[in-house]
Structure formats: structure tokens, C-alpha cells
Amino acid sequence: MPSLIDIRRRIRSVKNTQQITKAMKMVSAAKLRRAQDRTIAARPYGTLLRKVLGNVAAAVANDESAAENPLLARREERRILLVVITGDKGLAGAFNTNLIKAASRFVAEHSGEQITFELIGRKGRDYFRKREVAVSGEAIGLAAKVKYEDTAAIARRAMELFRNQEIDAVYLVYNEFKSVVSQKLTLSRVLPAELPEQANPVDYIFEEPPADMLNILLPKYVEMEFYRALLESAASEHAARMTAMDSATSNAAEMIDKLTLYMNRVRQASITKEIIEVVSGAAAAE
């Protein structure tokens, strides 16, 4: 049976841990609020860009020159670029583990193809480095402050590889932010690009040929998909960490209560034992 000193030391240790998890929860909540605002603010731009692109696509539906855009070229998927967006830190529940499992499952399902990785986030990078997979590029620290320029550079590199036919498809693996308690694991193909369809396309009057407009908008659309994915992932990571730290704080409180109850029982048993010894000694003296 542990002594009272050992139990008190254990309670003190759990309380210290509880303070850390509570502080991390508060920090994650503040970061989540900012990341959530940026994610929600970016969604209307992405929606409008898809709408405009859909209208342009309708205008060039019968234009053969538009169909020649290299970002629309469909080929047999023999060489695939898999962009995996994980977090830079742990203590976020199953956030990083689920992403890594999804990427590994994708590789297993495409065992006949050549998979090259683009790794965004320290956790994914560290995991796949040990597996000695083919890596096209790495990026660490982007989620701390998501910038369009950083994600656009990665998107441009992927588009360049696709245009040069060094790869046949580009897939993104990330967590889409739904709510504080819900993040959706998402696997989406961004290249070859698929033009959005408009149910009721607007008949715009274009100053430039629609095919030229398509050539301008399509790369922006791909860049926006990368940017949106990283924004969604950053918000999801903070939400997952906040939830995990809230759960850890609650578990610590329960453990402290149980240890305190156990300590009181041990102390009561010790006092009872001492009383019995005193009474027994007095009885023996008589």
C-alpha cells in the first residue's frame, strides 16, 4: 500500500498536469477562434470563384482550344502526387494519426502506381521519412500562420509537375473543419482539374476570349483549393487539440478526486490502527 506521502506526491503531479492541459485548452481555443474566422472568411471567395469558373466553363463548352488546357488533361494515373496536410505538434487526439492512416491506406489501394509525397506538417513528415517514401517537397510551420503565398507556391509546383507530365494526378489529404467537435477527413483530387457545372450559367459578355479567361482562372482555382485545405486543416487541428485538452483536464479532475478519496481512506486506516494500538497497549498494562 502506498504511503500518504506517495499519494500526496501523486495528487500534486496530477494537479500540475491539469494546469498544463487547462492552459493548452485555453490557448487552442483562442487560436481556433482566429483560424475559424479566417476559414469562414475564405469560403465565400472560393464559392464565388467556382461559380465564375462554372460560367466561363459553360461559355467555352464547345471551344476546342479550351479543352487543350494542360490542367484539364486526363491521363492514366500511373504517377500520383499525394499532398498530406498534418499538424506540426501532437496532443491533438487522433487528428494526425487519422490523416497518416488515410494516406497509408491510399498508398495501399494504389500499390500499382508510383506515389510521390508532398508533406505539409512536421508529424506527417517525420512519419513518412522513416518509411523512405519518395518525397517531392516538405513544408513545416505553415499552419501557424497560413499565408496564401506559401500555399500558392506549393500549388504552382504541383501544377508545373502536372504540365510537364511528370505526374498524372494530384490528391489532397486533409481534415475539413465542420465544428469544434467534428472534423471530416477529406481526400480530394485537384488535378486534373474538374470544371464546376452551373445549373443556370450566366451569359457573360467577355472582353477577353473565354478560353483565355479559363487559362487565367484555372490556376487560381487550384491555388485556392490548396489554400482552403490548409485553412481547414489548421482550424481542425486547433479544434481537435482543444477537445483533447478539455478531455484531459476533466480526466485529471476525476483522478484527483479518486486519489483524494483514497488518501483519506489510507489516513483513516492509519488513525484507526494507531487507536487500536493505544487501546491494546492500555489493556495489556491493566
Curated annotation (Swiss-Prot):
PROSITE patterns: ATPASE_GAMMA (PS00153). GO terms for molecular function: ATP binding; proton-transporting ATP synthase activity, rotational mechanism. It is found in: Cell inner membrane. Pfam families: ATP-synt (PF00231). InterPro entries: ATP_synth_F1_ATPase_gsu (IPR035968), ATP_synth_F1_gsu (IPR000131), ATP_synth_F1_gsu_CS (IPR023632). One of its GO terms (cellular component) is proton-transporting ATP synthase complex. The keyword Transport applies. It is a peripheral membrane protein. It comes from the Bacteria. The keyword Ion transport applies. Disulfide bonds: none annotated. One of its GO terms (biological process) is proton motive force-driven plasma membrane ATP synthesis. Keywords: ATP synthesis, Cell inner membrane, Cell membrane, CF(1), Hydrogen ion transport, Ion transport, Membrane, Transport. F-type ATPases have 2 components, CF(1) - the catalytic core - and CF(0) - the membrane proton channel. CF(1) has five subunits: alpha(3), beta(3), gamma(1), delta(1), epsilon(1). CF(0) has three main subunits: a, b and c. Belongs to the ATPase gamma chain family. This is ATP synthase gamma chain. The gene is atpG.
